[in-house]
A protein has these predicted regions:
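Extracytoplasmic cell-surface/polysaccharide-interacting catalytic and binding patches
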Residues: 1-50, 138-151
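Short, polar loop/linker segments at the starts of domains and inter-domain junctions
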Residues: 21-26, 71, 130-132
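Amphipathic alpha-helical interface surfaces
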Residues: 34, 38-41, 65, 81, ...
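Extended, low-complexity, intrinsically disordered C-terminal regulatory tails
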Residues: 43-70
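A broad, low-specificity signal marking well-ordered, structured residues that form hydrophobic/aromatic
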Residues: 54, 83, 118
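Active-site microenvironments of hydrolase-like enzyme catalytic domains
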Residues: 69-84
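Catalytic cores and adjacent binding grooves of peptidoglycan-active enzymes
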Residues: 74, 87-151
Length: 151
């Protein structure tokens, strides 16, 4: 099912890890509005990155998948509102994170994660975005405010 011009329902729930572990990663129908909001947000991100294609490493995660991946207990991935993305044709994960903010995309949260990808989430329909900007370099160090280099 196509949610927006460039993002399908299937792309937002795809997980090689879920397939490998035999986990059913299909969301309940009640999360469809959130997945549509995520797809619309990702369209804004794509536009901010010059229309370049995004690589979605992780979108929606059911509780079991999120637990197996070591995700946060209140992860927006489980609500269908977050994606971990890369855009190699645009630049590094940090450059992607900063471009999202500079373009005024209005995400709920942007996290530069481990120097390896950009986590972007959007507010649920009818909710205001927090505009939270964070970096995590290691689990031991935890999150720090702002979008910072890792290394």
């Amino acid at each position: 099912m196509q949610l927006t011009e460039h993002f399908s329902f299937e792309a937002l729930i795809a997980s090689d890890t879920a397939v490998r572990l035999g986990i059913d990663n299909r969301p309940p129908a009640t999360l469809l509005p959130n997945l549509r909001a995520l797809a619309e947000g990702l369209e804004r991100v794509r536009a901010a990155l010059g229309g370049r294609d995004l690589r979605i490493n992780s979108g929606y995660r059911c509780l079991e998948l999120n637990t197996r991946l070591g995700g946060a207990k209140k992860s927006r991935h489980m609500e269908g509102l977050a994606a971990d993305i890369l855009c190699p044709a645009f630049g590094s994960p940090l450059e992607v994170c900063r471009a999202i903010v500079a373009a005024g995309v209005q995400p709920d949260q942007v996290i530069h994660e481990f120097g390896k990808w950009c986590h972007v989430s959007f507010a649920a329909p009818g909710s205001a975005p927090r505009g939270e900007l964070l970096t995590i370099a290691s689990a031991a160090r935890g999150y720090e405010a702002g979008l910072n280099p890792v290394g």
